[in-house]
Amino acid sequence: MTMRASVPMFYRIKAYGPEPTNMVHIPAGWSDMGNGMDPGEGFVGELPVHSVYAGGFYMDKYEVSSNLWGEVRTYALARGYGFDNTGQAKGPEHPVRTVNWYDCVKWANARSQKEGWEPCYTNADGSIHVTGTFAGGCDWSANGYRLPTEAEWEKAARGGVSGRRFPWADDTIRHALANYYASSATYSYDTSPTSSHHPDYDDQPEPFTSPVGAFAPNGYGLCDMAGNVEEWCWDWYDVDYYASSPQTNPRGPASGPNRVARGCSWSETAKGCRVACRFQELPTFANGSVGFRLVRSAP
């Protein structure tokens, strides 16, 4: 039995405003991380299963759409922000993709400023990060937007249900539930009648994304936590991190070559859609399978 560390309680005066639009409140509490199913079905880095405590936060109900990306990016460019990529999408309500980790950090700051919140990402000198390669830190007490930690993402994806393979209360997956590459002959828990990309969205050319919110939400009310596009997280990736992860608000290793991405995409199989699955990419990486969504710390 894993002993849970005590969680310090404190009172912080911080203006957070009303319940954010199109965001879902994820309550503070304990949840499990890692592959609790058959250890042989997972990838390296998904063990050991361990309990972590995450403070409360709000998460975007949907992956960031091209429409929202463009609106904030236009605001940002007029105020001195610089991005590595313009971002691409199949349509205005499809998830933006072909954005790297650095783009997402700057975009998060711009969205915070646009809406009147405190930016989370600062440079080493304390200035707000708006351009160039990020080498600063995250102000975790700020009330603005930021990328979720890996622990926050998995807690949210589980939807309040423990011990399940996917972001819903069922251990099987099919095209009625998510936009992914079906392969029922390979995975017994893939029950789609076809072995292919999602037939509703495989219109050429790639990528075969679906509009955000096209599938039913999970128990917390979040859409597309499996499939459509992978989602950038804050953490550096370490294959052995789970063996030494803090129990309270883990935020990943101090450094590393790659950042974590979660959630799988339209091009990946059922194995990648499991909530325990961890991906890693260079922070400069950008392609048609990776997008993001943001969070804000809750009071």
What are the residue ranges of the model-derived segments?
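Functional-site microenvironments in short loops/helix caps that host divalent-cation chemistry
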Residues: 26, 32, 36-37, 99-276, ...
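Short, P/G- and charge-enriched loop/turn segments at secondary-structure junctions
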Residues: 1, 38-48, 198, 278-283
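A short glycine-rich, aromatic-capped structural motif
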Residues: 18-80, 98-112, 151, 227, ...
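Short, structured beta-strand segments at or near domain termini in extracellular proteins/domains
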Residues: 13-15, 287-299
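Short, composition-biased motifs enriched in small/polar/acidic residues
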Residues: 1-18
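Cytochrome P450 catalytic domain signature, combining two hallmark sequence patches
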Residues: 74-88, 117, 162-166
